Amino acid sequence: MTPESNLKSLGAKTPYIFEYNSDLLEAFPNPNPNLDPLITLECKEFTSLCPITSQPDFGVIFIRYIPKDKMVESKSLKLYLFSYRNHGSFHESCINTILLDLVQLLEPKYLEVYGDFVSRGGIAIKPFVNYAIKEYQDFKEKRLLDAK
């Protein structure tokens, strides 16, 4: 049995769920845990709802991480991010929840989430949050200072 055989979404017909669901996230074993690649994932079609007005909010989500023993399966990540479609939450809360869900799933060495949301009322909101294990705290602090 290969590690990929445990993945539910990859290669299967896709049922789209449009209400937040962290159970959609899946991981597979890191084939090179001795290396430290900085992996960037970009979702250009992120949508959630304003919790006050119920109007749709649109943005681009950037996720960067250095894996430890597990890596996120990209189709499951797409389905997870799409599950925010009818979820009412502020931009900052969405970004924080994405980080917490991925940290829980992956237990990475380092992980950051940045949201570049379309401006509303002339104000663009661009939240950034990051996480690191003890050995990567200096990297975390540098990334936080360098965040756009």
Swiss-Prot record:
Which catalytic residues are annotated? 50, 57
Q: Name one GO cellular component term.
A: cytoplasm
Top-level taxon of the source organism: Bacteria
User: NCBIfam families per the record?
Assistant: QueF-II (TIGR03139)
Pathway where this protein functions: tRNA modification; tRNA-queuosine biosynthesis
Q: Know the name of this protein?
A: NADPH-dependent 7-cyano-7-deazaguanine reductase
Question: Which reactions does this protein catalyse?
Answer: 7-aminomethyl-7-carbaguanine + 2 NADP(+) = 7-cyano-7-deazaguanine + 2 NADPH + 3 H(+)
Residues that hold substrate according to the record: 72-74, 91-92
Q: What is its main location?
A: cytoplasm
Q: Where in the cell is it found?
A: Cytoplasm
PANTHER family, per this entry?
NADPH-DEPENDENT 7-CYANO-7-DEAZAGUANINE REDUCTASE
Keywords associated with the record: Cytoplasm, NADP, Oxidoreductase, Queuosine biosynthesis
Which HAMAP family has this protein been placed in? QueF_type1
What does the UniProt function comment say about this protein? Catalyzes the NADPH-dependent reduction of 7-cyano-7-deazaguanine (preQ0) to 7-aminomethyl-7-deazaguanine (preQ1).
So what EC number does this one have? 1.7.1.13
Q: Name one GO molecular function term.
A: preQ1 synthase activity
Q: Which InterPro entries match?
A: GTP-CH-I_C/QueF, NADPH_dep_7-cyano-7-deazaG_red, QueF, QueF_type1
